[in-house]
Amino acid sequence: MTFRKSFDCYDFYDRAKVGEKCTQDDWDLMKIPMKAMELKQKYGLDFKGEFVPTDKDMMEKLFQAGFEMLLECGIYCTDTHRIVKYTEDEIWDAINNVQKEFTLGTGRDAVNVRKRSVGDKRKPIVQGGPTGSPISEEVFMPVHMSYALEREVDTIVDGVMTSVRGKAPIPGSPYEVLAAKTETRLIKQACAMAGRPGMGIOGPETSLSAQGNISSDCMGGQISSDSHEVSQLNELKIDLDAIAVIAHYKGNSDIIMDEQMPIFGGYAGGIEETTIVDIATHINAFVMSSASWHLDGPVHIRWGSTNTRETLTIAGWACATISEFTDMLSGNQYYPCAGPCTEMCLLEASAQSITDTASGREILSGVASAKGVVTDKTTGMEARMMGEVARATAGMEISEVNKVLNALVPLYEKNYATAPAGKTFQECYDVKTITPTEEYMQVYDGARKKLEDLGLVF
């Protein structure tokens, strides 16, 4: 049966008031894991240890499983404790009418984001930045300048302000609104000081409420050609605050970046099950959020990293499948275990950059070093590595990519529990000149040499 009109956030709100009642525990502990397990068995999904898939038939089965996951489960609204269901036609309408390309930024600093394919020879867009990591007020501009000064970086992804005027940006407070505006304004100024005043940014990251997110669209702050973030909840959940934010973004004709990080070992379960949920989450970004692009980020429940063997496999299969069967645009975010100025951090980020570039990601977003949880532990050097590795990987044969990854991941995966803490931005850079220390340059060159020995050609 056809639909009356294309589905949007207003329809979601209406259905969230009348949908099937469900407890959150039942959703998290029964509906999601049971359906994911059922679909894995139904379609016989087995990734056989490949980071980037070569089996097109298995990819098609994965897409069918992800589509079915969204169709049969729907999305859980945490405010109303009800399930929002879509019809099959509504889902296909969203998939068939996605934004096929868009521009981030303005003037000579603008970049065009358009579809890539598995093994594409074009380097993906590099969205460099702290990626939601906490950054102290005192070095907020210098940290973001360190990314804007890197030519490998095309756009900036914001960090979180730990304070504004010395006060915590508590959700719902006037300081949250001030922080959201200040975050985006300072980053715009940092880009201008780096000689790239038209550079696009992605955020806001500091605010946690709808009022905070909406307030970042302001004079001197975010504009329509910046990526505007809205986040889904784990797994296949959303709150009504986010729906209100989507309504604002749509009404303002903003580029919408729908974000979510599926958890391996969490509610979804194992590798194949989590990838099914990841596919469903991708599709939901375009049905519910009318997204311009979806920012992925499979993360390991124990290690808090996106660079593990399991999460790289999930990311590689999810992206390659989305790229093969749809025109949806997808990015991935980077959370290594190790901190800046360590070889491990650079190798972790490199493994993900190889996986993402080869599997067809349009945007690489990072790097949130030290798992993105330690204040001031992120710098432009990690984004440089992400970009250089992407450039070296673009166009490689997938069989060669998997061979490199099978050699690279063992170099760091035994060290998760003892990952080096690394150094703060202030210890990695001259804060006045925004240049990396000699120590970091040597660490960087050492990591680069190891990657060359594995077969990358810079």
Swiss-Prot record:
> Which InterPro entries does its entry note?
MtmB_MeTrfase, MtmB_sf
Superkingdom assignment:
Archaea
Q: In which pathway does it act?
A: One-carbon metabolism; methanogenesis from methylamine
What processes in GO biological process is this protein linked to? methanogenesis; methylation
Per the record's keyword annotation, is NADP included, yes or no? no
EC numbers on record: 2.1.1.248
Does this UniProt record's set of keywords contain Methyltransferase?
yes
Which GO-annotated molecular functions does the record name? monomethylamine methyltransferase activity
Instruction: Give UniProt keywords alphabetically.
Output: Methanogenesis, Methyltransferase, Pyrrolysine, Transferase
Enumerate the SUPFAM superfamilies for this protein. Monomethylamine methyltransferase MtmB
Name the protein family: Belongs to the monomethylamine methyltransferase family.
Q: How does it assemble?
A: Can form a complex with MtmC.
Record's protein name: Monomethylamine methyltransferase MtmB
The organism named in the record is Methanosarcina mazei (strain ATCC BAA-159 / DSM 3647 / Goe1 / Go1 / JCM 11833 / OCM 88) (Methanosarcina frisia)
- What gene name does this entry carry? mtmB1
